[in-house]
């Protein structure tokens, strides 16, 4: 009888731990937006986005500080609504997409700032250089798809900024843009 009670208690501890373990999600590339804007010669802001976004999120709702995120952007997917400018941005003057095909962000720490908000610090790797960047993140919601109760989605919005000069984007000043680049991010992710 003691063995049965002990076995039940041990099993209960493992089940309790599993109930509070982080959930894994895959970013839905059809519902992911990584936008940016930067100074355009003082006239206004130049806007753009990356069309190819992928990544994973490990989301621990019980202790958000134990969560992690990894995102990859295909540099060649940059879109500024101007094909000539897109081609120039992909060149060695800016993103050098042929030599550095991916831009990545990998979280290193998370600080909870509210019930649904956090500061996510991570390493942004651009042009082969990694620097810390802080994102202000809001968890928007999580629910099953209205047309498919077996598919669970969660959604996040984030903002942040960095200096393109810190990553060696060589020609920003020559074209009167930057150096600061503001990020505007919205992602939906599907629970695995």
Predicted regions and their residues:
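N-terminal signal peptide c-region/cleavage motif recognized by signal peptidases
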Residues: 16-18
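Low-complexity, acidic/polar, glycine-enriched regions of mature
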Residues: 20-192
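Bacterial N-terminal signal peptides that target proteins for export
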Residues: 1-6
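Repetitive helical segments and hydrophobic/amphipathic motifs
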Residues: 11-12
């Amino acid at each position: 009888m003691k063995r049965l009670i002990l076995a039940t208690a041990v099993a209960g501890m493992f089940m309790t731990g599993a109930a509070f373990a982080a959930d894994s999600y895959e970013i839905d590339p059809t519902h992911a937006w990584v936008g940016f804007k930067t100074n355009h010669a003082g006239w206004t802001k130049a806007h753009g986005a990356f069309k190819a976004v992928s990544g994973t999120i490990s989301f621990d709702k019980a202790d958000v500080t134990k969560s992690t995120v990894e995102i990859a952007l295909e540099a060649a997917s940059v879109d500024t609504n101007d094909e000539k400018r897109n081609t120039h941005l992909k060149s060695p003057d800016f993103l050098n997409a042929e030599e550095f095909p991916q831009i990545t962000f990998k979280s290193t720490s998370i600080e909870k700032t509210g019930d649904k908000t956090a500061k996510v610090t991570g390493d942004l790797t651009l042009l082969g250089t990694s620097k810390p960047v802080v994102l202000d993140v809001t968890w928007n919601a999580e629910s099953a798809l209205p047309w498919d109760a077996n598919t669970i989605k969660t959604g996040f919005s984030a903002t942040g900024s960095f200096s393109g000069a810190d990553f060696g984007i060589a020609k920003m000043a020559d074209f009167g843009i930057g150096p600061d680049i503001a990020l505007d991010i919205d992602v939906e992710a599907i629970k695995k």
